Amino acid sequence: MIKKYVEENKDRMLEELFSLIRIPSVSAQPAHKEDMVRCAERWKELLLEAGVDKAEVMPSKGNPMVYAERIVDPNAKTVLVYGHYDVMPAEPFELWKTEPFEPVIKDGHIWARGADDDKGQSFMQAKAFEYLNKNDLLKHNMKFIFEGEEEIGSGSLGPFIEEHKELLACDVILVSDTGLIGPDTPSITTGLRGLSYWQIEVTGPNRDLHSGTFGGAVANPINVLCKLIADVTGPDGKIRIPGFYDDVEEASDEERKLVASIPFDEEEYKKSLGVKALFGEEGYSTIERTGYRPTFDVCGIWGGYTGDGAKTVIPSKAYAKLSSRLVPHQDHTKISQLVVDYFNSVAPDYVTVNVEKHHGGHGYVCPIDFPAYKAAERGFEAVFGKRPLPVRIGGSIPIISTFEKLLGVKTVLMGFGLESNAIHSPNENMPVDLWLKGIETIINFHLEYDKEA
């Protein structure tokens, strides 16, 4: 019955999704401020059409929130669905094979910005609710909260949650904004890494200098910056910042055995990335490095003359953007300060170093023995025919730990993305058959959750 409904309504549901995708809700670009409001309003319309009791676009200190609810019984359990309607910028446009905000279906995939992250995945949740509501199968309450700033750090959502705790009160949170190991290998994300981010500025002379007249007499800020950041990581892949690993919890032998059982083709992985060899912290597998271990990376570096031709200067300043992915129990505020203190301590006298802290967030671990997780397991089994593997991933959704802190509930991360979906990149896509299976799986989650509740 579920599969039949999804198949019969496929074209309508896809067109509804496309109406969201066509709105370029790029939160990072002020030019799209009105598009953020338009997208929020469209979400409100679609949730009302799906059958919620009420839906509203609510103000925040930044982009608006979309809230909706269907209360079947005030005494029943409540599932809160979280997602985000903002998307990453589509640039560089010339690398897209299709128009990023004009979705098309080609080769069995939806091609568009937001096809996966997160309009495509969030809309699965709305369509699963639609089915349950239309067929009088919903035995627990449902609430929805969609924000418009996830791609820029969710700056408004924390204060919004704090202000509306009663409105958002629930027993569990359900999120589709993560991925699967493979199209036929279901998995549930049980861990997210946290994040710290900085910009470092190294200043030498008070102006750009002629490299002939002054070369050899003063330090070059770019050279100094390169050495400073290169020295952070040793040849063994270890991060040399004092105290960095103090709160890192080692994976148990049981967890490491589970990780080792996850299907992973290292040669195919290297091929897909276009690299000849992998590099990371010694003593850990690639999956462990990306899910269970912290990192330190340079995200961008610049300074001096970078235009066409030649200009022989010693620059006055050099800059870099830095990030760390953190594991549960590492406090991003503590790590941020450790990094600032480290660079200040190793900065040579012939330059001035300034490290500016940017946004950050904590990691998250989901237990695999509580009712909602078990319901998710059975939901995947019903559709994919096999039990999903619990996996930790390298990415961050900082607001998940905020939900736990402010609302006191756990989140189940039922994602359906694939690495090949190219989120944040040109040619983002989502396989149509996987999108439909996602709707079916979420429906089954709710049916199984009622048995647990």
Name each model feature, range by range.
Residues 1-93, 317, 334:
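N-terminal helical capping/dimerization or prosegment-like subdomains
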Residues 49, 182-183, 240-317, 328-338, ...:
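An extended, acidic, His-containing surface patch that forms the Zn2+-binding/catalytic region
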Residues 76-143, 437:
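Active-site metal-coordination/substrate-binding segment of hydrolases
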Residues 85-87, 109, 145-153, 176-181, ...:
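Acidic, glycine-rich active-site loops and adjacent beta-strand->loop/helix elements
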Residues 116, 206-208, 324-332, 361:
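A generic structural motif
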Residues 116-191, 453:
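Acidic/histidine-rich catalytic neighborhood of metal-dependent amide-processing enzymes
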Residues 159, 215-236:
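A short core secondary-structure module
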Residues 187-203, 417:
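Flexible glycine/proline-rich, aromatic-decorated loop/lid segments
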